[in-house]
From Swiss-Prot:
Organ and tissue specificity: Red blood cells.
GO BP: hydrogen peroxide catabolic process
Taxonomic path: Eukaryota, Metazoa, Chordata, Craniata, Vertebrata
Protein name as annotated: Hemoglobin A subunit alpha-1
Function: Involved in oxygen transport from the lung to the various peripheral tissues.
Keywords: Heme, Iron, Metal-binding, Oxygen transport, Transport
Residue intervals of the Globin domain: 2-142
Family membership noted in the UniProt record: Belongs to the globin family.
Positions contributing to heme b binding: 88
Quaternary assembly: Tetramer of alpha-1, alpha-2 and two identical beta chains.
Length: 142
């Protein structure tokens, strides 16, 4: 899916609200992922997965920082996430479906904190953007 100028503007509007809460929203996104989709916990056997765990908070911040890179390079998401794609495909071997699950959780967290900006149109734009991110992250899988 191609992101239109309107989609890009909508994504940047969401990010203007989310970008200053990377650790908080990132950890909430991961906590939701682990509760709603418990099979995703298998990738984090060395983490304390309890609420407000420092490991989950740090990784949540890392995840949303990567999303921020995609927002900052919205015209070249594959290029911005190339190294991360290599890491997930070759070293971590994360099942690609998990990126979609994470995206769903991120939309819920974003909408919970900022319900007025997550209009249906913005939701569509965010879904398209997150789909492009997931596609970029899975581009190195064989």
């Amino acid at each position: 899916m191609v992101l239109t100028a309107g989609d890009k503007a909508n994504v940047k509007t969401v990010w203007s609200k989310v970008g200053s809460h990377l650790e908080e929203y990132g950890s909430e996104t991961l906590e939701r992922l682990f509760v709603v989709y418990p099979s995703t916990k298998t990738y984090f056997p060395h983490f304390d997965l309890h609420h407000d765990s420092p490991q989950v908070r740090a990784h949540g911040k890392k995840v949303l920082s990567a999303l921020g890179e995609a927002v900052n390079h919205i015209d070249d998401i594959p290029g911005a996430l190339s190294k991360l794609s290599d890491l997930h495909a070759q070293n971590l071997r994360v099942d690609p479906v998990n990126f979609k699950l994470l995206n769903l959780c991120f939309v819920v967290v974003s909408g919970t904190h900022h319900p007025t900006i997550l209009t249906p149109e913005v939701h569509v734009s965010l879904d398209k953007f997150l789909s492009a991110v997931a596609t970029a992250l899975t581009s190195k899988y064989r």
